[in-house]
Each structure stands twice: as C-alpha cells, then as structure tokens.
Amino acid sequence: MKKISLPKIGIRPVIDGRRMGVRESLEEQTMNMAKATAALIIEKIRHACGAQVECVIADTCIAGMAESAACEEKFSSQNVGVTITVTPCWCYGSETIDMDPMRPKAIWGFNGTERPGAVYLAAALAAHNQKGIPAFSIYGHDVQDADDVSIPADVEEKLLRFARAGLAVASMKGKSYLSVGGVSMGIAGSIVDHNFFESWLGMKVQAVDMTELRRRIDQKIYDEAELEMALAWADKNFRYGEDQNAQQYKRNEAQNRAVLKESLLMAMCIRDMMQGNKTLADKGLVEESLGYNAIAAGFQGQRHWTDQYPNGDTAEALLNSSFDWNGVREPFIVATENDSLNGVAMLFGHQLTGTAQIFADVRTYWSPEAVERVTGQALNGLAEHGIIHLINSGSAALDGACKQRDSEGKPTMKPHWEISQQEADACLAATEWCPAIHEYFRGGGYSSRFLTEGGVPFTMTRVNMIKGLGPVLQIAEGWSVELPKVMHDQLDARTNSTWPTTWFAPRLTGKGPFTDVYSVMANWGANHGVLTIGHVGADFITLAAMLRIPVCMHNVEEAKIYRPSAWAAHGMDVEGQDYRACQNYGPLYKR
C-alpha cells in the first residue's frame, strides 16, 4: 500500500525584528538554537514505526506576521504536526506565535542575561492563554552564557517529553480504530464511543462484523504462501503446554492442527484488515487489499465467535508482539474483547515508547497476609506490601516475558528496532501454547503462557469513560515481581494457569489511591489494564493534557508533571487544575 507520510516537527526560530544591528546580531544564535533542537530530537526520538523523525526549520527567523505566515505555508506543505518555537531574545509575542489550534506547541525561551528570552516566553504564553491556544513552556533552570550552544539537561527533558507526546498526537490524527465485532460480554470498553475517538483523538471508527473475518478465511482472501510460512514457523517455534480439558473435550491431532491453522489465519486477516496487503490486489481483490487505515483494532470474540470458532488468543498475542514469521517488526495494537478503551491505552503506550504492550485483566489483589495463609511463605522485596495478579487469556505481547536485555543486561521490553532475532526467539522459547479450556472457549484455541521476569519497571494505564465528564486516564507506576517458584505455582493454580502472568507491585505514596496496594486495585476503573515498559507516567500525563484528557489517578513525582502553562491559571492544586483546564478547553478536536 502507499505509505502515508509521517508527521514532522516544525522548529520556529523567532527574533527581535529591529534592524540597525539588533536583528543582525541575533540571527546566528537564534538559528543555531533551532538547529540544536532539531539535532537533539533526530538523535533521541523515533516514530513508533521506527522511522527517524524529521524536523523542518523555518527558512528564516520569524520577526512578525509576514515571516510567520511564510513559515506556516512551509509547514503546511510538509505535514508538520508539532511545533517548537525557540528564541534567545525579546520578540513580538502574538505576532510570532503558532496559531494552529490543533497542533501541539511548545516555546523554549533561552535563559540568558544578554537578551530577555524569558520575557518573550512569558509574553508569548500570555498571548496563547488569552487566545485559548495552550502551549508548553520550556525555560532552563540555570542562566547560560550567550555563546553556550549546549542544551541543559532540564531543557532536554522537556523538549523530548513534549516531542514524544506531540508526535503521538499527530500520528493518531486521521487514523482509525477497527472494531471487529461489537460488545463482548457486556464489557463497557467494547461499547465503542465514536465521539471519543473523533473529538479527543482525531480518529475514525471502522465497524466490521466478525462475519467479514469468517468470509476472508473461508474464501481464502489472504496470502496462501504466507500461511504456509506461518505454519512452518509455528511448527518450529511453538512449545505446547498441558491440555487441562476433560477427556471428552480434548481434540485429536487433526483437530488441533485445524485450530492452529485458523488461529494463524485470524492473525493474518486481522492484520490485512488493519493495514492492507498488496498481495491481495495481485489476486484481484483490490478492495480488500486496501485495509481500513487502522492504527489500532479490537476483536470481540466472546462469545458469538468463540462458542463455535477458535478464540483470538493466538492471533492477538502474535499481532501485539514485536515479531512473527516475518521476523522482528512493529507491534500491532489489538485489544482483546474489543475493549477499545484499553486499546487506546495500548496505543498511547506504543506511540510513546515504540514497544509492545501487555494487555491484562487486573485480576486479583493478594495481600501479604493472604499469600502467607495460602502458601506458608511471606512476600518480600518489591512485593512486601502485596501484589496484583495481571493475567488474561488474550492479547499480552510475547515480549512481556522480558527475555530481551537492556544495555546493562537487565530484563526489559525494547522498542522493536532494537530487538535482535535472538531476543525474539528467547521470548518464543519462554512461551507455552496451552489448549483453551472448553467450558470457556467451545471453539478451541491456544492461549500463550509465560511469566514476566521480576524487577522490571512498568507503567500500568487505563482510559475510562465517565458520563458527564468524558474520558479520564489512570496511571500506576511500579515493577514486575518474581515470586519463589513454589509460591507462584500455588497462586497461579488458583486461577487459570494456562494464561500469561505478570505479578505487579505499584509504587506506593502513602496517599489516596496509592496508600497501599489494595487501594490501587480498589480504585482501578475497569477490569482491564495495560503495562508499558519503564516508568513513563510523566509522558502519559503530557500526552493526556494535549488531548484534554484529565488524569484521575497517578503516582508520578510532581516535579516530572509537564502540562501547558495555562493549566497553572486553573487553580492552585495540580490535579484540580488538570480537570478544570480540560473542561475549559474541551476535546482537542471539538465536535
């Protein structure tokens, strides 16, 4: 399919327009700030697909309306979706700002004494706030000399956080959420809210009945050669777990083979429906070859599909992973049970980090007392205050086994462009494929089963819809926990031991929903959550502010919270500011 161009970041160097030596003395310094900003972003950030980020710098420094308009014309022609304005000096506030109301924007005012960059920053932000076009403020903590071309660490942190979140906003705009099926078992997140996607994310919803998946499989609307490759890959790499079904429900070898084949076909066809597949056009299936321009999807499955056909566990797990029979590649975002709101949290996490996401039920809170009663052993270390069992039959990415390694040799989940084939193979080797339990999945299927390594930093998130308020975001930073094998086996056996498990210990603050682990579980807004690698809650907070989604629960340090400057005018308590500002400005793409 034709590659849609990726959004770029526009850099706007603004300058004092007075000639006779004033502007002339500032041209080089101002343009160098723009170049340094672009170089930093290009070096440190990639698109979620792995492509290098492109920065577009205005052809000239911007002193007023004419040069601002020329800059906007250039940006409009080059798909600029995010802008950063930079200056070391006084400039003319409202005459030089970026006025596009839907484009995330930041201003870096150089902290120097020779020229008042801070004064312009304050004046420009005042104009933004008065006009109702929020912008992010960037101002270094320490004074720099005029000839200092370095970017201080605190400025770099804000530039990169803004750029990551801004690119996520721009990348989602114009894409679609593919809803395959409808509401699964009454789960509210699968009541797909078109207005939410349109007004807050700038996306469309493509609703497709599950019979379309059936049609594609039955009528061979797929690449038949690829199917053979996928089957050969599975035969080489799949390690099968215990079949816990009663004897009358166990399948024979031929039946198991048919279930595997259909499971792989489901993965292929859902992928083709999301992004298209030119091979289908070569077969004369031009319409089907186009796909639905989907950046995320969900599959209802239960129960109208799973009562008669193989479940979506294998397809979802493989699509959400960073690898399959085609090798290492960008993960897809596919929500089990068509939980679109958890799918959005997965989408946020992937766009911010480039990594695969772990979709899970927020299944059980285990108190230290309960664990000791059941196992006779005490929790300790990161788990000493209790743990949450995150487990779901469906779409946890196989990367979640954490068999990949960071630069220090520690377990992690890497952006897909950093993953070696050996690491992908290690994740596969750590996974068992267990026959689905018949009473739950009458059509069969295979569930992935792995155990996440312990001591890995994660951020758990969830988007919820509240009537009268709209979407809210929950964030809980914490760590995976490794339990003694005997303890894990005893606890795991009390639920469904054929599914993947992550034992999660949130970081506690002693306040509110983070008073203790029980409070985290009790305040979680739905039955599902998402794990994103790393402590990246601050990035989620910045992204949410750009989209006007208030954060109702988080344990991120206040010093890391980065929102538009206008939020400070909405009261004195930081979280109340967020609610009032989001209500005041409304969704980014108001409908």
From Swiss-Prot:
GO biological process, one term: D-arabinose catabolic process
InterPro entries the record matches: Fuc/Ara_isomerase_C, Fuc_iso_dom3_sf, Fuc_isomerase_C, Fucose_iso_dom1_sf, Fucose_iso_N1, Fucose_isomerase, Fucose_isomerase_dom2_sf, Fucose_isomerase_N/cen_sf
Gene it is expressed from: fucI
Organism, as annotated: Salmonella arizonae (strain ATCC BAA-731 / CDC346-86 / RSK2980)
Protein's name in the database: L-fucose isomerase
Annotated compartments: Cytoplasm
Pathway: Carbohydrate degradation; L-fucose degradation; L-lactaldehyde and glycerone phosphate from L-fucose: step 1/3
Subunit field text: Homohexamer.
Catalysed reactions, as listed in the record: L-fucose = L-fuculose
Binding site for Mn(2+): 337, 361, 528
Family: Belongs to the L-fucose isomerase family.
Documented EC number(s): 5.3.1.25
Alphabetical UniProt keywords: Carbohydrate metabolism, Cytoplasm, Fucose metabolism, Isomerase, Manganese, Metal-binding
PANTHER family (UniProt xref): L-FUCOSE ISOMERASE
Function per UniProt: Converts the aldose L-fucose into the corresponding ketose L-fuculose.
Major site of localization recorded for this protein: cytoplasm
Record: active site: 337 (proton acceptor), 361 (proton acceptor)
Cellular component, GO, one term: cytoplasm
Domain of life: Bacteria
Enzyme's top EC category: isomerase
Signal peptide: none
GO molecular-function term, one example from the UniProt record: L-fucose isomerase activity
Cofactor: Mn(2+)
